[in-house]
């Protein structure tokens, strides 16, 4: 949804919940407004130190924004996780500035009108929302409506970013996220949460013709167990090659230059619970 609002890919996409690891800013420029979207990890009941730190990140973000968008997929029933988030948002509203919350029924294109109506009713009963809006990032349905609603809750003030800037994400972070997105494609349930990606270096050089600019990108993929390492690498390295091919195309499109992508998979046992490992990985 962030990508649909910005009009360009600034955040990775995965069908797995709880795979966002840091806040991602996407910037929407309009003649009369500038919308800075802060895409955060989802609030959840943490089971690891990483989960606790991500929750702290989200709660800190909630104190800094002017309006909150709470996404509830239309193809899933409102469940305990949604109720937990609704309670956390209500607590934040009581303790803070009373920041308005817009409930967003995402993936509206995946359900019929009757199912969507049921979902919107369930959302309305979940909390006291400033607005409720169904959207589809895939088809663009009501993305413009959501944009106008979010802008309506913004205070007047100067633009925070220059025209044309779509994100303030460091390039290395975006590269790492694109590799992680490719690695998450089609993996089993437990692996997404155990995978971390770190860019070691990005070194410019010229290609073999001596003229074409290139970039050598060295990336490490960390997992928690040897069995997970085997999944990422695949038989004879086939899966890791596929990950590299997919990620390389995305990274070249992002950077506008050819790259040589060097991927290495390492085991960092229980890194999600290890403060030192978390620090090394930027958490």
List the model feature ranges, each with a label.
Residues 99-102, 109-171:
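Canonical P-loop GTPase G-domain recognition
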Residues 18-21, 51, 55-58, 62, ...:
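Amphipathic alpha-helical transducer elements in NTP-driven molecular machines
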Residues 17-19, 41-44, 74-78, 108-111, ...:
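Conserved nucleotide-binding/hydrolysis micro-motifs of P-loop NTPases
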Residues 1-15:
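A conserved segment at the C-terminal end of the G1
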Residues 26-38, 52-132, 186, 203-214:
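Conserved C-terminal guanine-recognition region of P-loop GTPase G domains, centered on the G4
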């Amino acid at each position: 949804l962030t990508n649909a609002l910005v009009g360009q890919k600034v955040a990775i996409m995965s069908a797995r919940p709880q795979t966002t690891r840091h806040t991602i800013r996407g910037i929407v420029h309009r003649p009369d407004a500038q919308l800075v979207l802060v895409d955060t990890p989802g609030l959840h009941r943490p089971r690891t130190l990483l989960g606790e730190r991500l929750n702290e990140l989200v709660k800190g973000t909630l104190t800094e924004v002017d309006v909150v968008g709470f996404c509830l997929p239309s193809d899933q029933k409102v469940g305990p996780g949604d109720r937990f988030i609704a309670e956390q948002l209500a607590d934040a509203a009581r303790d803070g500035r009373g920041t308005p919350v817009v409930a967003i029924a995402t993936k509206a294109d995946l359900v019929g009108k009757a199912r969507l109506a049921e979902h919107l009713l369930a959302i309305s009963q979940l909390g006291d929302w400033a607005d409720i809006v169904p959207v589809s990032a895939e088809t663009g349905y009501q993305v413009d409506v959501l944009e106008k609603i979010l802008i309506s809750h913004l205070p007047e003030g100067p633009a925070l970013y220059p025209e044309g800037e779509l994100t303030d994400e460091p390039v290395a972070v975006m590269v790492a996220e694109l590799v992680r997105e490719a690695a998450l494609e089609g993996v089993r349930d437990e692996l997404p949460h155990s995978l971390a990606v770190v860019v070691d270096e990005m070194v410019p050089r010229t290609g073999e013709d001596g003229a074409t600019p290139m970039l050598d990108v060295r990336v490490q993929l960390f997992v928690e167990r040897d069995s997970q390492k085997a999944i990422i690498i695949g038989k004879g390295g086939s899966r890791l090659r596929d990950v590299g091919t997919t990620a390389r195309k995305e990274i070249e499109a992002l950077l506008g230059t050819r790259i040589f992508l060097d991927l290495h998979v390492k085991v960092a046992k229980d890194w999600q619970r290890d403060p030192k490992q978390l620090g090394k990985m930027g958490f």
